[in-house]
Amino acid sequence: MARTDEIIARTAPGHLNDHNLIDREVESLCDGMVKYEKRPAKRHDGSVAEGIYNAWIILDNPKQYNSYTTDMVKAIILAFRRASVDRSVNAVVFTGVGDKAFCTGGNTKEYAEYYAGNPQEYRQYMRLFNDMVSAILGCDKAVISRVNGMRIGGGQEIGMACDFSIAQDLANFGQAGPKHGSAAIGGATDFLPLMVGCEQAMVSGTLCEPFSAHKAARLGIICDVVPALKVGGKFVANPTVVTDRYLDEYGRVVHGEFKAGAAFKEGQGQIKEGEIDLSLLDEKVESLCTKLLETFPECMTKSLEELRKPKLHAWNLNKENSRAWLALNMMNEARTGFRAFNEGTKETGREIDFVKLRQGLAKGTPWTEELIESLMPTAQK
């Protein structure tokens, strides 16, 4: 009987059709701020599976915490499309440069300086954003979110669109919408109720309070978490988070919650004194890629398609009217919130005076440029 590699050499077609939409390098669309790399896939024994790769899609905007610009969104769409149709790709690893941020969502500078007050432009931007989320959900390969740092706002939304998430435990998660002039309707309001239940989804989507990677694992938002902090040459759990017990004296779950007061500050000091090492994160990601490799490819794709259906159903049901609302919201609250974040500083803060705004609206005060200017953090000081 002929060997498998002999059969492949004899029967594989001499020409393969190209199913990419456009023939462009991903990096060329955004000055290299999204990188596309094919890294050799490995078997369980560590040997390279010749001709098979894992596609790494890497956000490279660390100065702005890997937030995505319009051009980066275009590149991400192209990258996922490329990985999806590449016959040699086993799995996709979606991540960011550095150890501070996976992604913090849309680029607030661009939002504040270009899209604020321009709903017709933001509506077109949201077409691209929607296509980005759909590209992740529609990828023919398993998608792993390698959470190298904080995953906030739109970053949390594109992260939850992935099939698996593995985080280093210094990473924080959460939404930012109502605190900064928006609503988390770019995927979070679709995915969170499915993943964590209605009450916890409500907490995350409205209060905008960040939570730890350990809590994300407990809630079911990520599938695994690994330490990244080394103190004295040894890995230790995030010292700002409760990880040594599950319940408090009243029976309430405290595992994964942030410590308070002096204990939290002490933990912050330990982080500053230690070193960040993402080697365990990379080992976990590589291990998962190998597990995915050792499966039938079409059965894997079908399993992904079926298991994604709850997310896809909610997403497709809401994405178009969400796009319309987000565009119109750029005339008032988003216009105000994004400007406040962009123009504010550490000294002035990056949020408006919410009580003053509510007091004004309660008296029927119209949205005017004068009102918006008066609410800016710099005006309050």
From Swiss-Prot:
GO biological process: benzoyl-CoA catabolic process; fatty acid beta-oxidation
Record keywords, A-Z: Hydrolase
Reaction(s) the record says it catalyses: 6-oxocyclohex-1-ene-1-carbonyl-CoA + 2 H2O = 3-hydroxy-6-carboxyhexanoyl-CoA + H(+)
Pathway: Aromatic compound metabolism; benzoyl-CoA degradation
Coiled coil: none
Acetylation is among the record's keywords: no
Gene Ontology terms, MF aspect: 6-hydroxycyclohex-1-ene-1-carboxyl-CoA hydratase activity; hydrolase activity, acting on acid carbon-carbon bonds, in ketonic substances
Upregulation: By benzoate.
Enzyme Commission designation: 3.7.1.21
Listed transmembrane segments: none
Segment forming the signal sequence: none
PROSITE patterns: ENOYL_COA_HYDRATASE
Family that this chain belongs to: Belongs to the enoyl-CoA hydratase/isomerase family.
Subunit structure: Homohexamer.
Role of this protein: Involved in the central benzoyl-CoA catabolism. Catalyzes the addition of one molecule of water to the double bond and the hydrolytic cleavage of C-C bond in the alicyclic ring, 6-oxocyclohex-1-ene-1-carbonyl-CoA (6-OCH-CoA) to yield 3-hydroxypimelyl-CoA.
Protein name as annotated: 6-oxocyclohex-1-ene-1-carbonyl-CoA hydrolase
Species of provenance: Geobacter metallireducens (strain ATCC 53774 / DSM 7210 / GS-15)
Gene name of this polypeptide: bamA
